[in-house]
Amino acid sequence: MLGCSNDRGEHGCPIWLGALIGLLASATACGESVFLPYAGAQYEHNSNVFALPNSAVAVLANGDPRLGDSDLKTVVGFEEDYLWDRQRLYANAEGRYFEYDHFGDLSHYEYLARVGLDWKLFSMLDGTLLGSQERVMAAFANRDTQTALAIDIDRHGIAKFNIQIAPEWRLETSVDHHNLDAPIQDFPDYGLTETIGHVAAKYLGFSNLSYGLSADYSDGRYRNAPVVGSYVQTVLDLTMTYAASGLSSFNGAVGHTQRDQGQDQGNISAITGELGYTRKFSGKTSIHIDYSRAVNSYIGAGGSELDSTVNVTLNYQPTFKTGIVLGVQEVWSAFEGQTIPGTDVIGRKDRSPGASFKLNYQALRWLLIQPYVNYQRRTSNEEFFSYSGTVIGIQVLAKKPAPPTR
């Protein structure tokens, strides 16, 4: 279940993933190993499983007026670290099974397999090699044409190479090859393939301030569906991080994004960036506020979207065993560009407020209990895409405690 599918040639294990697994295995003889198995269960109720506006639409979509359902998720997995010299090899494998009470056709399994290497050479070179593959149910809120179960296979191959040019200057580079199989109604082989390159130069000459310039270049294509095709995207940003004190910190980026998608559909030219602020009020309480504006791919219809997002997160740790996380979010989305036949995107604008609550209770060193509540609402100028829903659940996770750090 945790291996790579061999349904088709492109679903096999990538060469880089196999090589990293082999490297991880070979390191066991010469490094310090930490193996952390875990298992858990999660039961939740979702008041609007298919993210539909009302029961009348549900009848048209699947013949059933019911919107909500409960499901039980069971999970088993492990994390493993190998440390030797200045290098770190790590792996994470996880299997999950979801069983739905009413909509039995939605019951399914998922998995995650990830392996990576953080390496350092001398005092000036460092980097990362990371490979991952995940099987996951597609979110219905992001699927324009279906209420049936759809399974995505998401793969990443990431390489990072960084140089400390001088005590004050650092050059960071990375390449991410991303391959997503995302079948939708009438197009079972639909997906997205993209390669994203990143380079950033940072000045670190001040103790509490760093700044620099970053550039990203993405070359991608939507595949195996008519009308949609390739895109090219460039992002240029001025970046900054600032620690005002031991209690407050800021991070920010401002720049421009240009996305060109075939036939002048999905082209976006916009000012983009992010701004974040973190404040520790005490040893128990902190708040994080961030705003971002970014151009993203809309996999549900093969187009582009411009998203503006505000997040506010409050963390409260009253005791060693208990932590509370409160969050509110608002997302404004404008959709552009190519659309797969049967979908409706061009001119669509959404507003999506949400709120969340999670209690982390560390009952024992190896036992975590997490009740949670999430609320999500979306209003759209295309009424079919408006919905609201609440998810209430509890997760129980048993995990071998990590050994104390030396």
Language model feature labels by segment:
Residues 1-13:
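N-terminal secretory signal peptides that target proteins for export/translocation
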Residues 18-19, 29-30:
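Cleavable N-terminal signal peptides
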